[in-house]
Structures are given as structure tokens and as C-alpha cells.
């Protein structure tokens, strides 16, 4: 086997990225994603692309947030691993897969080849997630009318609410943040994400019961690809009443009232209550995302 050549791309040779087959239909999944040419890298053997990766960030980011497009040719898992291992950015890897990838043998083999390459590069599986996309033909979810929704200008209110919400959580990213830096880190990471989104700060809302107690928060946002459910969370002492659905319904209405023609969302496979709420609110699963944490550097 000939030697592998790792190559960073720019505008002059960005076309090389598109020469590898796309069995997992990543191009369609990223039709609204804007990738920078100089954040793309390929691995070549005998002049042909055998692995590729595209790192991604928002328009104002100076470094990538994640690598969200990663492919390897059949039998080239080692090339894919080398492509990730030698990259200047060691960030989370997101593999965006068709919803039926487990049932289709061809898709499963392609997905597992990418998993193998990621693990060989030192990445560790973090979580598997459902990706949702609501569209108007699904019908708007009914608003139960049980909660009072309010704009809240004080970030400290959201920070404390997030600490309470994450004190009992099923979310893998939050659990990782708590393990690394406690509840404060988990809450701050959420706030940083909300602030990173280009939508107005005024959209963030708290929700109160008829007794005046905080039930939770919902954060409707636009990310760089469009409108999405940024966060849904119920404080522990108010769980068991189905309020997460109320928050999701309100978040959907809020975005639609401001012109959204679709709303995207995601939740972990293990978050069964939230997955049930998305189903109830008529959000179909359109794809799945497998998140790998980056290799740890000593």
C-alpha cells in the first residue's frame, strides 16, 4: 500500500473534498451548513481521496467548534484515524447519520467504519442523539396554558435555573461538564451556547406555575443553520407534571410566530421523557447524531 498524504485544503483545491463517495448522505444533511475551505482536510493515497473531514464553527468563530463531516473510503479506517489524529484542532466529532442506519446493512457498515476510525484516533463515544425537524405540515403542538412565560433580562436567573436543572440530568454533555467542573461549568456552558447563537437575547424565557413557582426555562434560538430549540429544562421539584411538553410547545409557537418555517431540535437516546415529548409535539426524527469526545492530550 502506498504512503498516505494528509492535505489541508483552501479555495483552490476545495473541490477535492467532494470526490469521495457519500453513502451516509452527509451532503443533504449539511445543505444549510457553511463549511470553510481552510477548515477541510483530506487524506490521499495514489492521488485519490480516501478520507475527509470538515471542521465547523459559527461565522465569527476563529477556531472550529466541532468536526461534523467525516468520511472514510472502504478499508481506509487507518487513513481516517490519521486525518483526525494529526489535525490542529482536537474538538468533538459529530457523525450525522440517516435515521435508519442500524436497519440498513450498507449504511451500518459505513457508519461503523467511521466509528472505528474515530476510536483509532483516540476519540471516545459520548452519546447518541435523535435529530428532529418540525415543519408546518405536522401541525403546531397544542399549548396547554398551564404556565406563565416571561422574558427575563438577568443572566443570573438563568444561571441559577440551569444549576438546578442540571443537578438531576440525563444529558450526556451536561454530565460530562459536571464531572469536569461541577454544576457551575455545566450552567456556564449552556449560557455560552445561548449567547453564541445569533438570535436575540430577549427571546430567552422563564416559565412559572399558577402558584408563582419557577417551573423551568425554554430557549428558542437561531443557530447558524436556522431556528431551533436551544434548550428545554424543568427544575427537579416541578418534574412529574409534564411541563417539558408545555415548554416545548411554547418554544415552537414562539419561533413560528417570528417567521420560522421549520424548527430543529435534538435529544439524547437515553433521555426517554424528552424523546416522548418531541413525539407528542409532532417532531419527527429525521436523522441521528453520534457524538465522540476528542482524544485527551497530555
Briefly describe each language-model feature range.
Residues 18-45, 59, 176-209:
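Active-site rim helix/loop that mediates acceptor-substrate recognition in acyltransferases
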Residues 118, 278-279, 283:
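Conserved active-site tyrosine of GNAT-family acetyltransferases
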Residues 29-101, 210, 214-227, 235:
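Conserved donor-binding loop and adjoining core beta-sheet/short helix segment
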Residues 93-95, 229, 263-267:
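Conserved hydrophobic beta-strand within the GNAT/NAT acetyltransferase core sheet
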Residues 1-29, 143-184:
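Short amphipathic alpha-helix that is part of the acyltransferase structural core
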Residues 76-90, 234, 240-257, 275-280:
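Conserved acetyl-CoA-binding loop-helix of GNAT-fold acetyltransferases
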Residues 76-153, 292-294:
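Acyl-donor-binding surface of acyltransferase catalytic domains
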Amino acid at each position: 500500500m502506498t504512503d498516505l498524504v494528509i492535505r489541508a485544503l483552501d479555495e483552490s483545491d476545495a473541490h477535492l473534498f467532494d470526490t469521495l463517495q457519500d453513502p451516509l448522505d452527509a451532503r443533504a444533511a449539511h445543505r444549510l451548513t457553511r463549511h470553510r475551505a481552510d477548515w477541510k482536510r483530506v487524506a490521499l493515497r495514489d492521488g485519490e481521496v480516501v478520507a475527509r473531514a470538515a471542521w465547523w464553527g459559527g461565522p465569527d468563530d476563529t477556531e472550529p467548534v466541532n468536526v461534523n463531516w467525516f468520511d472514510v473510503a472502504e478499508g481506509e479506517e487507518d487513513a481516517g484515524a490519521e486525518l483526525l489524529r494529526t489535525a490542529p484542532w482536537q474538538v468533538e466529532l459529530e457523525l450525522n447519520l440517516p435515521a435508519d442506519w442500524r436497519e440498513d446493512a450498507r449504511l451500518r457498515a459505513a457508519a461503523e467504519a467511521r466509528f472505528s476510525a474515530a476510536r483509532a484516533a483516540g476519540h471516545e463515544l459520548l452519546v447518541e442523539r435523535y435529530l428532529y425537524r418540525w415543519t408546518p405540515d405536522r401541525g403546531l403542538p397544542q399549548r396547554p396554558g398551564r404556565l406563565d412565560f416571561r422574558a427575563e433580562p438577568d443572566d443570573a436567573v438563568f444561571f441559577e435555573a440551569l444549576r438546578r436543572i442540571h443537578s438531576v440530568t440525563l444529558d450526556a454533555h451536561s454530565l460530562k461538564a459536571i464531572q469536569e467542573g461541577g454544576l457551575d461549568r455545566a450552567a456556564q456552558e449552556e449560557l455560552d451556547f445561548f449567547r453564541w447563537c445569533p438570535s436575540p437575547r430577549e427571546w430567552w424565557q422563564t416559565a412559572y406555575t399558577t402558584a408563582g413557582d419557577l417551573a423551568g426555562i425554554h430557549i428558542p434560538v437561531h443557530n447558524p443553520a436556522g431556528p431551533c430549540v436551544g434548550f428545554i429544562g424543568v427544575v427537579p421539584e416541578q418534574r412529574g407534571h409534564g411541563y417539558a411538553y408545555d415548554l416545548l410547545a411554547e418554544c415552537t409557537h414562539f419561533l413560528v410566530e417570528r417567521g420560522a418555517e421549520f424548527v430543529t431540535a435534538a435529544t439524547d437516546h437515553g433521555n426517554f421523557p424528552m424523546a416522548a415529548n418531541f413525539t407528542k409535539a409532532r417532531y419527527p426524527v429525521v436523522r441521528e447524531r453520534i457524538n465522540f469526545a476528542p482524544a485527551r492530550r497530555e
